[in-house]
């Protein structure tokens, strides 16, 4: 493995492929702010020496020094096959280093913003109001000083003592990021709580981490008050939102269920404004983190048992930032402009934390939804007009359905749109890059594409990142043409600080997660009991190692030893395939398989992934097989906007049905359900007949966190789902196969 401090700038200085980039940087002192800013303007690395060269071989196999049977070769990015990169530069080895760089270089740029509410009318203003990087830097240091002062006074410790964990419980908002930056400035570790992680889980995390402080949104007040008696170590409760003097007095004197914690420390409510004021009048010098400082403990629920706390260091996040810089491109005409991103996905999950880390490193303005409701996303996108946004497949499929429904309102409009989209799709397939044709800019954009982009608030958008779940290739191809935007699908886990690979935006053959990035290496391990042989067909369990990968679970050596071997390889539990270009595709999940009555092996996650990635008519799926039966049944979430038109082709009355009526009729009308089932089965050419569903129960969102059948990242808790849906599954088997006579 590479030395932990190998920098992106070291790679550029030493690799002859980047000679032209090295020449451009020669006029600056290496590592200076001016050098780094010029470097940012010349990236990504994939442009050197030629982008087309990179596309042909994105990752390369290096020798397997251990020569172990049952493993593939080790794969590294073709950009950095000799060493793994752990930072952009040796002056930028932590997330705090990156933020402070941006605050120095672009102090007046917009940093954190939200839509203000007009208190007189109670309506939200049609604009975002931002605080600058300079202001955010000042505020986060004041908040950090205030946290240390208040907590340590209660603990009777020196004010600069930073040996504790800060817990955060809130929806996305600027105060979330301010708190995170305050922790970075004083080398404080934080952890995020979220109510959907499971009953009593927040209390479990607070007590496991021994966090003395909880910073929360006012909307979580009831939950916090309910938890107080079970919080053993919390002495400071901080509400992010404004609290009046009377509200604070009532909380501390009347509503607080207990007055002291288990250490006999008094528990007190504060507002974040008070904490900031304390820090302003009692400034404590910053305590910058080192690469080995523990940045965050990110709890991942998994599909069984208590959540595991993934320890992520500043080296992990700095490595992830370096990977992002190596692959993202900002065009020359945008480099000196104020650009924006929308913080939409939950900050309690590592995916959005990684996105925001990059945003803060490059000087983006970060906007937040005006209320924690995903249905207002498009409304706020239209106002912010972001340059980039990270979205999950469920949102993209809704975009697809909405666009198609809008285009279907007239025959002429539909025919014009189909002509344009077919032409663009052909150009993408032929070129393998963005459509730079005159026809695209003078005709296609004016007639169709600009209108679609404006309707979704994506008029300034350059790329969309997606991950966390499979996405249909048809959805990717359609949106790429309809929006003329590169969509990049990534792969990563909490343990790898989100994405370690990312597909290229305009590749001819979509569907992979791209090649391993510059901050990690990977290999495949054979899973013979599932028929995967890594050393023969490059299919097996994906293992990852490198500076972007975690080292341990918090206070959990047993789970750590199961996940990470003595050589540092983290076993992901995902079965992957590596193609001839070095790109990774996830195809299955280790250990989740069973037999049907005739002896066929069934891998339900593989089947679910194929349905979700191939069929635009569904949003969720749980595949179930009774070992005493000969066929599969399932619980399916239906995308009504996408499904309604295909069913209405034979049944015009379907167009008049509400979403609820459509779902009700699908479940009640066996003939209609059979037609829908045949439609979704025809999408899944990659499945054998015995792997396809024979009967289904549909719903709008049948797999919910509230029913405890999925994790917060929507992985199925298979045992709990089987129990929860037992009666329904039994009914489906009693009804029998709907497709026995069909050719599957």
UniProtKB/Swiss-Prot annotation:
Q: Name one GO cellular component term.
A: peroxisomal membrane
Residue ranges crossing the lipid bilayer per the database entry: none
Q: Where in the cell is it found?
A: Cytoplasm; Peroxisome membrane
How do changes in temperature affect this protein's function? Optimum temperature is 25 degrees Celsius.
Keywords of this protein's UniProt record, alphabetized?
ATP-binding, Cytoplasm, Fatty acid metabolism, Ligase, Lipid metabolism, Magnesium, Membrane, Nucleotide-binding, Peroxisome
Q: Report if keyword Ribonucleoprotein is assigned.
A: no
Q: What is its main location?
A: cytoplasm
Q: Where is this motif: C-terminal peroxisome targeting signal (PTS1)?
A: 742-744
Q: Which Pfam families match?
A: AMP-binding
Protein name, entry field: Long-chain-fatty-acid--CoA ligase 2
Q: Gene3D superfamilies from the xrefs?
A: N-terminal domain of ligase-like
E.C. numbers: 6.2.1.3
Per its database record, what is this protein's job? Activates endogenous medium-chain (MCFA) and long-chain fatty acids (LCFA) by esterification of the fatty acids into metabolically active CoA-thioesters for subsequent degradation or incorporation into phospholipids. Preferentially acts on C9:0-C13:0 fatty acids although C7:0-C17:0 fatty acids are tolerated. Is the main if not exclusive MCFA (octanoate, decanoate and laureate) acyl-CoA ligase. Required for efficient MCFA beta-oxidation inside peroxisomes. Facilitates the transport of MCFAs into peroxisomes by passive diffusion, by decreasing the intraorganellar MCFA concentration.
Reaction catalysis annotation: a long-chain fatty acid + ATP + CoA = a long-chain fatty acyl-CoA + AMP + diphosphate; (9Z)-octadecenoate + ATP + CoA = (9Z)-octadecenoyl-CoA + AMP + diphosphate; hexadecanoate + ATP + CoA = hexadecanoyl-CoA + AMP + diphosphate; (9Z)-hexadecenoate + ATP + CoA = (9Z)-hexadecenoyl-CoA + AMP + diphosphate
Q: What else is known?
A: Present with 358 molecules/cell in log phase SD medium.
Q: SUPFAM superfamilies, alphabetically?
A: Acetyl-CoA synthetase-like
């Amino acid at each position: 493995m590479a030395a932990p401090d190998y920098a992106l700038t070291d790679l550029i200085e030493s690799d002859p492929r980047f000679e032209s980039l090295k020449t451009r940087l020669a006029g600056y002192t290496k590592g200076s702010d001016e050098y780094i800013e010029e470097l940012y303007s010349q990236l990504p690395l994939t442009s050197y020496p030629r982008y087309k060269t990179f596309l042909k071989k994105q990752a390369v196999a290096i020798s397997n020094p251990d020569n172990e049977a049952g493993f593939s070769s080790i794969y590294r990015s073709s950009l950095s096959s000799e060493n793994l990169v752990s930072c952009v530069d040796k002056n930028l080895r932590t997330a705090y280093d990156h933020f402070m760089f941006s605050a120095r270089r672009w102090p007046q740029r917009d940093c954190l913003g939200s839509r203000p509410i007009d208190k007189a009318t109670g309506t939200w203003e049609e604009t975002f109001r931002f605080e600058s990087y300079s202001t955010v830097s000042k505020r986060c240091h004041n908040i950090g000083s205030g946290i240390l002062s208040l907590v340590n006074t209660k603990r009777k410790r020196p004010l600069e003592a930073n040996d504790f964990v800060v817990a955060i419980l809130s929806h996305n908002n600027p105060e979330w990021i301010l708190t995170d930056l305050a922790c970075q400035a004083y080398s404080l570790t934080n952890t995020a709580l979220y109510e959907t992680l499971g009953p009593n889980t927040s209390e479990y995390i607070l007590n496991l981490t021994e966090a003395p402080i909880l910073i929360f949104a006012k909307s979580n007040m009831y939950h916090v008050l309910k938890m107080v008696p079970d919080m053993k170590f919390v002495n400071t409760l901080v509400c992010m939102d404004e609290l009046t003097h009377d509200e604070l007095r009532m909380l501390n004197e009347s509503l607080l269920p207990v007055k002291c914690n288990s250490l006999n420390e008094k528990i007190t409510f504060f507002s974040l404004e008070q904490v900031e004021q304390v820090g302003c009048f009692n400034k404590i010098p910053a305590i910058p983190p080192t690469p080995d400082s523990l940045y965050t403990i990110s709890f991942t629920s998994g599909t069984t048992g208590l959540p595991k706390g993934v320890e992520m260091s500043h080296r992990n996040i700095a490595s992830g930032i370096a990977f992002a810089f190596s692959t993202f491109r900002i065009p020359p005409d945008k480099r000196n402009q104020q650009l924006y991103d929308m913080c939409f996905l939950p900050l309690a999950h590592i995916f959005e934390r990684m996105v925001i880390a990059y945003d803060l490193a490059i000087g983006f303005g970060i906007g937040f939804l005006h209320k924690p409701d995903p249905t207002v996303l498009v409304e706020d996108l239209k106002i912010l007009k972001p340059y980039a946004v990270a979205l999950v497949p469920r949102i993209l499929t809704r975009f697809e359905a909405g666009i198609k429904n809008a285009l279907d309102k007239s025959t002429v409009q539909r025919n014009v749109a189909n002509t344009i989209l077919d032409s663009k799709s052909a150009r993408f397939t032929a070129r393998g890059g963005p459509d730079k044709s005159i026809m695209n800019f003078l005709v296609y954009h004016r007639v169709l594409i600009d209108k679609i982009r404006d309707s979704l608030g994506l008029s300034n958008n350059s790329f969309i990142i997606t991950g966390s779940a499979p996405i249909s290739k048809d959805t990717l191809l359609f949106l790429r043409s309809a929006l003329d935007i590169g969509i990049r699908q990534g792969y990563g886990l909490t343990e790898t600080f989100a994405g370690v690979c990312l597909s290229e935006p305009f590749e001819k053959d979509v569907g992979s997660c791209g090649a391993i990035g510059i901050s990690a290496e990977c290999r495949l391990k054979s899973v013979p009991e599932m028929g995967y042989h890594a050393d023969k067909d490059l299919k097996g369990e994906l293992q990852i190692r490198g500076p972007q990968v975690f080292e341990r679970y918090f206070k959990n050596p047993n789970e750590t030893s199961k996940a990470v071997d003595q050589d540092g390889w983290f076993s992901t539990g995902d079965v992957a395939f590596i193609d001839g270009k070095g790109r990774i595709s996830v195809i299955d999940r280790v250990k989740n398989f069973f037999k049907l009555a005739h002896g066929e092996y069934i891998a339900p996650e593989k089947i679910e992934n194929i349905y979700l990635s191939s069929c635009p008519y569904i949003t969720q799926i749980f595949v179930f097989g009774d070992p005493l039966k000969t066929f599969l049944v399932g619980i399916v979430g239906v995308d009504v906007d996408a499904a309604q038109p295909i069913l209405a082709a034979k049944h015009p009355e379907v167009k008049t049905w509400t979403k609820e009526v459509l779902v009700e009729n699908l479940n009640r009308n066996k003939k209609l359900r059979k037609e829908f089932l045949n439609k979704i089965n025809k999408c899944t050419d990659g499945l054998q007949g015995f792997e396809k569903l024979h009967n289904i129960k549909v719903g709008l969102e049948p797999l919910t966190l509230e029913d405890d059948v999925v994790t917060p990242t929507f992985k199925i808790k298979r045992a709990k789902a089987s129990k929860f849906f037992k009666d329904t599954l039994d009914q489906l088997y009693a009804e029998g196969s709907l497709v026995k006579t069909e050719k599957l």
